[in-house]
Amino acid sequence: MDINKQKTKWDISIFKNENFTLPVIKSPFNTYYNKYIDSVINDIEEWHRECCFLGREKLKGYIESKPYLFSAYYYCHLNEKVLPFIIKFVDMFSIYDDEYLEKTNCSEDVINQFLDKNYKDKNIYGVEWFKIVEGLKKYGNKQSVNKFLKEFEFFIKNVHSIHLKENANYTNINFEEYTNTRSIDFGFDLVVSAAIIDCEEPSKEIRESSLFLTLNTKSSIICVLVNDIYSFVKESKQPDTMNYVKIMANKKKSIQKALNHTNKIINNTLKEIISIENQIKMQYKENNLYQYIERLNSVISATIYLHQNHKRYSVHNKNYINKNN
């Protein structure tokens, strides 16, 4: 097949003669591990056994994969009271996303049980979700919990429609359109809202400022492109173009050039983020802003660290990492 005719689909066989290595992205921010994880993890594992979302056969392997590590790094600053409920949310909903939302036959009923507390046909996911909500409301910051719930509703209503469009042609949409769509799919705003759920948001004036909005947009770009790079090997066998490395490989006729191009965008965007953070901290003297930036940076750093080190990604990428990068 002629790569110049490859417009709407991805075909890895076109690049079968090309060797490539994944870049090792370096975070400019510190990576932290939540100090309360070890004290709650036994209770979380027991909760999994009681709920048995995946069935008995898959449960052992799931627990052995240490899914709690995502919460340990993404939500490294959360206090010990709210943390268990966020871990439950992350674990349960990642399973739900894989088992239901990514399936093209996912119905509205599957989604509605998370949005209507009185929905009569709730399964174990819906039942546990509202228990989690009660815990978050009890121990989280009221304003931030409400923000999280709004982001969750937006995410669950939109992410399935994105999955349904995965076979659409993303090759010809512009960078902003692509990253905006993938930011929803990644759940960036939801992840950040969970990271600050036990503290107050910055003031409305700050949240509506162009600097703050740009900071969040740039940060979401990092998370999206890091995910695209370290998911590429696994996703390379699928025909869709919902991965920026695939899009650029089709355009540049080279996987390595696409990876290098994407890595360059990441590095340049990280520099822009640092500059924006310095500007916004000079303009606004507010402790809630400083705390928000600290947690936003931890989300970025966790994204980079986990995509390079967690088994979910490393099992596919171990033969493609460029250690000398």
From Swiss-Prot:
Disulphide bond pairs: none
Motif NDxxSxxxD/E motif: where in chain: 227-235
Molecular function terms, GO-annotated: lyase activity; metal ion binding
Keywords tagged on the record: Lyase, Metal-binding
Enzyme class: lyase
Recorded superkingdom: Eukaryota
Membrane-spanning ranges: none
Family to which the UniProt record says this protein belongs: Belongs to the terpene synthase family.
UniProt free text on domains: Contains several highly conserved motifs that are important for catalytic activity including the aspartate-rich 'DDxx(x)D/E' motif and the 'NDxxSxxxD/E' motif, both of which are involved in complexing metal ions to coordinate the binding of the isoprenyl diphosphate substrate in the active site.
Name used for this protein in its record: Terpene synthase 11
Organism of this sequence: Dictyostelium purpureum
